[in-house]
Amino acid sequence: MKEQKLIHEGLITESLPNGMFWVRLDNEDLVLGYISGRIRRSSIRILPGDRVKIEVSRYDSTRGRIIYRLRNKDSNE
């Protein structure tokens, strides 16, 4: 059975090497996020200050996969 992942929205706070980012979730948690393969293939640029959707495992809530970059109009704010 496939593991269920939790999907959160957050804000990119810092860019790290190799496509990794610090993401502050809406519930104020800090998560280390990496870019999914689809975003890498599409060469979508992610910068600090961008809002993203991130998929977090139930077992390790400190790491997650960035699956979508939100446009300004898509965000809740």
Curated annotation (Swiss-Prot):
It is found in: Plastid, Chloroplast. It comes from the Eukaryota. HAMAP family: IF_1 (MF_00075). PANTHER family: TRANSLATION INITIATION FACTOR IF-1, CHLOROPLASTIC. One of the essential components for the initiation of protein synthesis. Stabilizes the binding of IF-2 and IF-3 on the 30S subunit to which N-formylmethionyl-tRNA(fMet) subsequently binds. Helps modulate mRNA selection, yielding the 30S pre-initiation complex (PIC). Upon addition of the 50S ribosomal subunit IF-1, IF-2 and IF-3 are released leaving the mature 70S translation initiation complex. Belongs to the IF-1 family. This is Translation initiation factor IF-1, chloroplastic. The gene is infA.
